[in-house]
């Protein structure tokens, strides 16, 4: 039996969540990292809405968004590892922000953010005047984000449609009902999503995206390895220090033999560009320190375009 087999899963068919529990709570953790980055001296990204969304979930979450990472003052190694995790979140966010900017520059005015969580791109990016952004996620997660931002007078920078549906269900039908136009090229985003889907659901997701995509559509994907050790350690510290009881390892699917995302897309008509997260972190001035290499998360960041007629 492998270490992966020994982890008891907290997931079940048809499970759901609010923003402070299960998979939903990981969106708060990611938003906290964006808040930390935004408060830095030379931020790679700016998300002024992240602190609002995180602090509204309670004082423990607000502490997690503390740019000084004061809750780890007596743990220098933990503080460095957490800072590295925030750097990674900043780099992947920057990658996807640039992706949407390039898509808009190419005349693509329809975007779909899968498992949107507390993603605020519909509010904070510079969208073309006719842009339409669809956000797909669990109903209570979308409701939390919309209510908090509305209560602070925040309005979207594009026409935004929240599509409240589980990605394991018939989300294409819900997307079409919300006004999605399958004849227009689309910029798709699957960021921080794939580990929370079973392998067969990941394949179906890509099949549905491809079926809904007009020529010239694009997609950006964050593809994970099965080794999430560094990420696990960060979440364990959050639990132990802040009382945030999140077992991220038990929330992800780690079955062997999952289809490689880049390979699947390339085999189905997409032209794929990929870069390792560590290469991208080094390029942007956030390299992984040598003594933290074994604890750092490893992912591949993908961009792909669909140029052929099917």
Swiss-Prot record:
Chain sites annotated for binding S-adenosyl-L-methionine: 137, 166-167
Annotated InterPro entries: Ppm1/Ppm2/Tcmp, SAM-dependent_MTases_sf, SAM_mthyl_Trfase_ML2640-like
Enzyme Commission number(s): 2.1.1.-
Gene Ontology annotations of biological process type: methylation
Alphabetic keyword roster: Methyltransferase, S-adenosyl-L-methionine, Transferase
The keyword S-adenosyl-L-methionine belongs to this UniProt entry's keyword annotation: yes
Known function: Exhibits S-adenosyl-L-methionine-dependent methyltransferase activity.
Family: Belongs to the UPF0677 family.
Protein's UniProt name: Putative S-adenosyl-L-methionine-dependent methyltransferase MUL_4763
Protein source organism: Mycobacterium ulcerans (strain Agy99)
């Amino acid at each position: 039996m492998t270490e992966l087999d020994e982890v008891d899963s907290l997931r079940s068919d048809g499970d759901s969540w609010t923003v402070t529990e299960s998979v939903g709570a990981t969106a708060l953790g990611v938003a906290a990292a964006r808040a930390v980055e935004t408060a830095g001296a030379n931020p790679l990204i700016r998300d002024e809405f992240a602190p609002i969304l995180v602090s509204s979930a309670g004082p423990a979450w607000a502490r997690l968004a503390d740019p000084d990472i004061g809750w780890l003052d007596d743990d220098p190694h933990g503080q460095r590892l957490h800072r590295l995790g925030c750097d990674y979140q900043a780099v992947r966010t920057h990658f996807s922000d640039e992706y949407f900017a390039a898509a808009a520059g190419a005349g693509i005015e329809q975007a779909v953010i899968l498992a949107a969580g507390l993603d605020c791109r519909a509010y904070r990016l510079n969208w073309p005047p006719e842009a339409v952004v669809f956000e797909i996620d669990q109903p209570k997660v979308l409701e939390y984000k919309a209510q908090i931002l509305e209560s602070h007078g925040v309005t979207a920078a594009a026409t935004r449609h929240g599509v409240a549906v589980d990605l394991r269900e018939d989300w294409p039908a819900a997307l079409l009902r919300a006004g999605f136009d399958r004849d227009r090229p689309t910029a798709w985003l699957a960021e921080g999503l794939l580990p929370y889907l079973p392998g067969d659901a990941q394949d179906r997701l890509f099949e549905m995206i491809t079926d809904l995509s007009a020529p010239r559509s694009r997609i950006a994907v964050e593809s994970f390895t099965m080794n999430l050790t560094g990420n696990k350690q960060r979440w364990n510290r959050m639990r132990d220090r802040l009382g945030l009881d999140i077992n991220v390892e038990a929330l992800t699917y780690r079955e062997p033999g999952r289809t490689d995302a880049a390979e699947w897309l390339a085999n189905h008509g997409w032209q794929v560009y990929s870069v390792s997260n560590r290469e991208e972190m080094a390029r942007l001035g956030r390299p992984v320190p040598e003594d933290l290499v074994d604890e750092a998360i490893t992912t591949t960041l993908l961009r792909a375009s669909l140029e052929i007629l099917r």
